[in-house]
Amino acid sequence: MRRLLCLLTLTSGLALANAQDVLAQDQGPEPQSAASVENVSIPATQDIAASDATAQTTHQVSRMLSQKFGVAKAKAEQISAAVMSAASKYSLPPALLLAIISIESRFKEKARGLNGATGLMQVVPAAHRKLVRNIDLTEAEANIEAGSAILHGYVQSARGDVGAALKSYGGSTAYAEKVSLQVQKFTPQTEPATAGD
């Protein structure tokens, strides 16, 4: 008898709990307290501002590539977007990548150099077989991605010494100095305009 009474009590308790769950689902979610509303994720104004600044910088670079280097508008937009993306991904200054591209290929995607160096950043496939396997180095995004990854690896190997990394990338101290001079020319184009500009 006790068992039967216990079973009935347990069953009715479960039925009541189930009914409350169904009722709660019908009424929708519970109202949130002020404390729980504070934890709601809203895109930060800073993130939006950073995104706008990146878009503005990409546009500035694109315009400069068209005007100074004669790159077609659509191609300039593609190159500048790829540079900004790779710069962000590999924590490299966009001006550095642009300086390398200007020296290596003068922004000519199909450029060919010594030892099979190919594309905008003159990546040498034989020296980086694993990295560039099955990649079309004459395609802007792929070339900038590969060249930036290579440069990033050199910077890491040199423990952050960009000059030493450039020497590894280009093969000489003179190359590193030449790139450094070009970086100074590209830096104003890769910095977001301020309100007073």
Regions found by a protein language model. Give the residues of each.
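Sec-dependent N-terminal signal peptides
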Residues: M1-V22
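N-terminal propeptides/low-complexity segments immediately following signal peptides
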Residues: Q20-A44
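Catalytic glycan-binding domains that act on GlcNAc-containing polysaccharides
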Residues: I42-D197
